[in-house]
Amino acid sequence: CGCGIAYKLITAHNTFTESSIDTSIFLDFVALATISDMMPLIDENRIMVFHGLNVINSKPRIGLRNFLKSINGKIDESKISFNIGPRINAAGRMKTGKIIVDLLIEEDINIANSLSNDVEHLNQNRRRIEKSVVDEALSQIDNQRYTNIVCGEGWNQGVLGIVASRLIERSYKPTIVLTESNDEILTGSVRSVKDYDVYKSLSDCQETLLQYGGHKYAAGLKLKKSNFDIFKNQFESIVKDSVGHKMFTR
């Protein structure tokens, strides 16, 4: 993810300039970002996350401590994915990511407490909106299809990704959640299931899309509203053919 790339640039700069700065103190940021962005935990990602989790468990930043209070035991990938990550992402989805930046670099405990309370309120609001969208989206699920592709008017764009993840929990298939972002344009988030490269399937549909980007397990896209049915059927056909007409299993 972008945070991991930034970290590699910092370490390369240190090597080039022979700097004595200990860059390992930033690995907690890398772990949080890599896991929250659902990046594959392979190769260097896996190594950086391993060491980043060690930093979080041994010397957590002041801004993280309130989040950690509600978690029992050692912080691992799962606890970041399901507890800390959603709170971090909620700020950007519901208001602005700057709140999280300010929180993570804050060294005053009182200011950090105030910021973490703000984040918690945003997360609670996100959960209410998410539940409403999930309830609407579930009514569009077709159990006979190999994909979940749903679209709703007025859905908050900030929760589309997590709604897609929630739908996968109920119906284990590659999932796309879309809403109308502006006049006649649909914007959406894509989430995949284990071992299925959803980005490749999007690439095979690119002629019907205005824009798309992401990686194997998560992506975003835009398309004309008039192309929705064409895209929905094309994506379904590609996924169905690629898995040999066998339904996904956990």
Predicted regions and their residues:
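Active-site cavity-forming subdomains of large catalytic enzyme subunits
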Residues: 1-16, 42
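Hydrophobic helix-and-loop "lid/oligomerization" segment in the mid-to-C-terminal part
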Residues: 14-236, 244-247
